[in-house]
Amino acid sequence: YKISDIPSGNYSAVQFGIGVPKASNAKEPKDFSASSILSSPAEYWSSWKSYIFFRPEGKIALDGSTVFDTDFALHLGSDDALTTYDISRTIQIIDGQTTNVDITIDMQKFFNSVTLHDIENTPQIHSLVQLPIMKKLVENLKTAVK
């Protein structure tokens, strides 16, 4: 993600959110200009009336083998999922130069920090009845971002 107009100087932390503020989350992609990141219908969950903020997807091997043959898709969204992160990091911004700040998500912590996610029984999150499970994964995500 590219951010412009940060004054040059030395910074000791970065603060950012994963999610969409409630007022924006209440809107649909058609309500935003084409240049907005929120204009993409691929990131909107019409049945939840919410954007998807974090979407780990892939294949896993559930039987202990090395054959990754089971799909998983854990889509996190809703007003309750918006989380702000404060990460201590020395950052120097110099006029006219690009500064990169790497943010890492430890997926092992995402699946198994506060609560162990039972991916065998819940390999997909696509329904409002799964909101309690999604909230547990959001709590795990809080410990996984660094």
Regions found by a protein language model. Name each.
Residues 1-146:
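A short, solvent-exposed, low-complexity linear motif enriched for acidic/polar residues
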